[in-house]
Amino acid sequence: LVEKFGIDPNNAFAFWDWVGGRYSVCSAVGVLPLSLQYGFSVVEKFLQGAHSIDQHFSSAPFEKNIPVLLGLLSVWNVSFLGYPARAILPYSQALEKLAPHIQQVSMESNGKGVSIDGLPLPFESGEIDFGEPGTNGQHSFYQLIHQGRVIPCDFIGVVKSQQPVYLKGEVVNNHDELMSNFFAQPDALAYGKTPAQLKKENVSEHLIPHKTFTGNRPSLSILLPTLDAYRIGQLLAIYEHRVAVQGFVWGINSFDQWGVELGKSLATQVRKQLHASRVKGEPVEEGFNFSTKTLLTRYLQATTDVPADPSTLLPNI
C-alpha cells in the first residue's frame, strides 16, 4: 500500500501485525504522531521511561517487582475477595485520559471467560476499570466507594506541581490543597469512622448510621516525583505489565480480543438491512429477533428524510 501511494518503502515505519492497538503506544503507531506533536526529544524520554520499567519487570525479584506486586494485588481482589471493579484516581488533571486508556488495556486484555487452552475458567477474571481525576471523582462517585460497594482504588499523586499557585494569606498553595486530599482518601477508606467515634463528637443519634464508615477498603498509592514524559512512560509501562501479570496468573490470553468480533459481525447484517430498506424499500427481515426488528422498524420510520442515494452531504457548520 505504501508503494502504491508513491512512498519509498524505506521511508515507511514498520508495525507488527500481532501488536494490538492498546499495546501500540510505544510502537511507530504511537511514536510518530506523538513526535509530530511534542518533538522526538520528548517522546524519546517517554520511551526511556517505559524501557526502564521493562528492564525492572524482567530483572527485579518478585517481592520488589512493581508490576508483579500490583498484578497479584488485582488477582487477589478480583478472584479471592470478589471485588469486580477498580477505580483509577489520578490527582492531576493532566492525567484525565489515563483511566479511559487503562480501561481499554485492562478490560480488552483480561475480559476473558476461558483459559488460553480454551477451557472455561473456574473463577472470575478481569476487572471493571473506571476513574476520574481526584477531586472530580470525589464529588461524583467517591460516595459509593466510601459507603457503598467495596471498590479497590489506585491513587496516583505527583510531588511537583505543573502549575503551582501561591496566594498571599492562603494556608497552603493549590498543589498542597490537592495533595491533602490525595493523602487523606486512602486513610478514610482503610480506617473509616466508627459509631463510638461519632458519639464522642456528639453526632446526633439518628445520624450515626449515616455517618459511619466501615473502613477496611483496599487501595494503593503511587507517588510520582514529577509529571514529565519519562514518568508517564514509566506509569504506562507499569500498568501494561501489570495487566499481563494478571493474565499470566489467570492462565488467559491477554493479547487477543475476540469479544469485539461478534458485535462487528452483527453490525454488518444491520448495515445491509438499513441499505436495503433505504434504497429498495424492503421491510426488516425476520432474521432479526423481535426486539431488534421492532427497534429497527421504528428507527427507519423516524428517519424517512434520509436520502436513499445521496450525493455527498456534509453537516452545515
From Swiss-Prot:
Transmembrane helix listed as a keyword: no
CDD domains hit by this protein: SIS_PGI_2
Pathway field: Carbohydrate degradation; glycolysis; D-glyceraldehyde 3-phosphate and glycerone phosphate from D-glucose: step 2/4
Key words, A-Z: Cytoplasm, Gluconeogenesis, Glycolysis, Isomerase
GO biological process: gluconeogenesis; glucose 6-phosphate metabolic process; glycolytic process
EC number from the UniProt entry: 5.3.1.9
Localization terms from the record: Cytoplasm
Gene Ontology CC: cytosol
Matches recorded under PROSITE patterns: P_GLUCOSE_ISOMERASE_1 (PS00765), P_GLUCOSE_ISOMERASE_2 (PS00174), P_GLUCOSE_ISOMERASE_3 (PS51463)
Catalytic activity: alpha-D-glucose 6-phosphate = beta-D-fructose 6-phosphate
Keyword DNA-binding: no
Annotated GO MF terms: carbohydrate derivative binding; glucose-6-phosphate isomerase activity; monosaccharide binding
Catalytic residue positions: E108, H139, K264
Any single Pfam family the record assigns to this protein: PGI
Similarity comment: Belongs to the GPI family.
Subunit (UniProt): Homodimer.
Protein known as: Glucose-6-phosphate isomerase, cytosolic 2B
Organism: Clarkia lewisii (Farewell-to-spring)
